[in-house]
Design a protein with these regions (language model features):
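Positively charged n-region of N-terminal signal peptides that target proteins for export
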Residues: 1-6
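Hydrophobic membrane-insertion alpha-helices, especially the h-region
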Residues: 8-21
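Ser/Thr/Pro/Gly-rich low-complexity linker/stalk segments immediately outside membranes or between
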Residues: 25-39
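Extracytoplasmic "Venus flytrap"
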Residues: 38-61, 65, 76-88, 97, ...
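Hydrophobic alpha-helical
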Residues: 58, 102-121
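Helix C-cap/helix->beta junction micro-motif
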Residues: 65, 69, 122-124
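Flexible loop/hinge segments that line or gate small-molecule binding clefts
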Residues: 114-152
Length: 153
């Protein structure tokens, strides 16, 4: 049951990332259906068993989605190794690679504003997962989302 909930949770993340991309891309006058969607995923620590399992589920669900929808899903996954500066650099790399969406498992939830500024500058939607950024940061832009459980529960 627990694995099913994890799978469902992260299927929501991957489909949410693609839906975000499509939603905002379709507003552009030069929009055409994508052949691929590139998603940058930065993890606070890949050695964490739970986070590692999340990553594997994301990769599996992306492959399933690719097969059913015919749109190539490119997942760039990086491990920040519990270092916020490393994670910030990874986001820079994702943006330089032209990622359509970034998904972030924050090292330091109070440092999300740096990543948000970078995403806003490039008009790239962001999904934060598992560790919720400070609400003031999430409310700064309509292209920012959090997927995860309420930590108080």
């Amino acid at each position: 049951m627990k694995r099913y909930r994890y799978g469902l949770f992260f299927l929501t993340v991957i489909l949410g990332a693609f839906a975000l991309y499509r939603c905002f891309a379709e507003r552009r006058p030069d929009h055409k259906e994508p052949e691929s969607v590139r998603i940058g995923i930065t993890l606070y620590r890949d050695a964490d068993t739970f986070i590692n399992s999340i990553c594997r589920i994301l990769e599996t669900e992306a492959k399933k989605y690719e097969k059913t929808e015919g749109i190539r899903m490119i997942l760039d996954v990086m491990d920040a190794k519990e270092d916020q500066n490393t994670q910030n650099s990874q986001v820079d790399r994702f943006l330089a690679l032209g990622c359509d969406v970034i998904c972030v498992n924050m090292v330091d939830r109070s440092a999300a504003s740096v990543i948000i500024d970078k995403a806003m500058d490039r008009e790239v939607p962001g999904i934060f997962f598992n560790r919720e950024p400070v609400s003031e940061d999430l409310n700064r832009w309509e292209k920012l989302f959090y997927v995860g459980a309420n930590p108080k529960e």
